[in-house]
């Protein structure tokens, strides 16, 4: 029997943005544990805004497990939060509301800033660095510094070793801003892996004395890009059949549900979706071929192939709850 370090990970009830929590327990197994072998576990919900002190117990229900490459005999256990009966989903548990669909494919582009001492990494103590332009996909110390690339490369390796379907990294438009991409076949798979990848990034930066800032517009009303979580999506029908009529009907449905979508695409999105910095205004729906200033970007390949394929919803922001985004798509 081997002692395994099980890191149980969940989303708390902090508002307006649910943050990730984690705690470790040790259990013995003959081999790396399967999901079915992982026990339920309790936690103090009064300290995560998920319960009151007089009835503080909440339950963690494992829903997926990955190897933890950072720890010897470690496991990363993504969990849903349940009520004390272990059967009723907690009100903050948005994952439980998602019907899994193996034909639904999602690719999330998670943007974020590195912060140190309250400012984006690479910014001077006062004022701003040179304007945007050289930083996107940039190389060289003056564009990306030294420690940022070290972190994103290490995060990439950790995710791949954990079995997360991490598809790539790049420096983003603003200095100190980066992106990673996660793809999943199946609604819940993609969202689970985004959450675990976020957790791994935040945990990794601890040893560098650096924070990860997921707010969508941390630099406010300035000439610096905000952070999104663009969602590339398709269904089996959209990939295999599609067609212009179906596409136009789909866009009409998206326009009709504009405000419902914006409500779950992350807090403070009005600060980011201004019509500037590669965004569409938050209160207007639009789509266009290769248009990064539209709500929905339509790839050239989609039109050239007679309208089967995938689409990109550019409105979701970097603090978006991926489970709620699945419900809106």
UniProtKB/Swiss-Prot annotation:
InterPro entries, alphabetized: Gln_synt_N (IPR008147), Gln_synt_N_sf (IPR036651), Gln_synth/guanido_kin_cat_dom (IPR014746), Gln_synth_cat_dom (IPR008146), Gln_synth_gly_rich_site (IPR027303), Gln_synth_N_conserv_site (IPR027302), Glutamine_Synthetase (IPR050292)
Q: One Pfam family of this protein, by short name?
A: Gln-synt_N
Q: Where in the cell is it found?
A: Cytoplasm
**EC category:** ligase
Give the SMART domains listed for this entry: Gln-synt_C
Residues forming the GS catalytic domain are 89-329
**Key word Zinc-finger present:** no
| Residues the record lists as binding ATP | 167
All copies of the GS beta-grasp domain together span: 4-86
Q: Which UniProt keywords apply?
A: ATP-binding, Cytoplasm, Ligase, Magnesium, Metal-binding, Nitrogen fixation, Nucleotide-binding, Plasmid
Gene Ontology terms describing biological process: glutamine biosynthetic process; nitrogen fixation
Q: Which domain of life is it from?
A: Bacteria
* Binding positions for L-glutamate per the UniProt entry: 278
GO MF terms listed in the record are: ATP binding; glutamine synthetase activity; metal ion binding
> Assembly state and interactors?
Homooctamer and homotetramer.
Q: What does this protein do?
A: Catalyzes the ATP-dependent biosynthesis of glutamine from glutamate and ammonia.
Protein name per Swiss-Prot or TrEMBL = Glutamine synthetase
Q: Which organism is it from?
A: Rhizobium meliloti (Ensifer meliloti)
Name of the gene this protein is made from: glnII
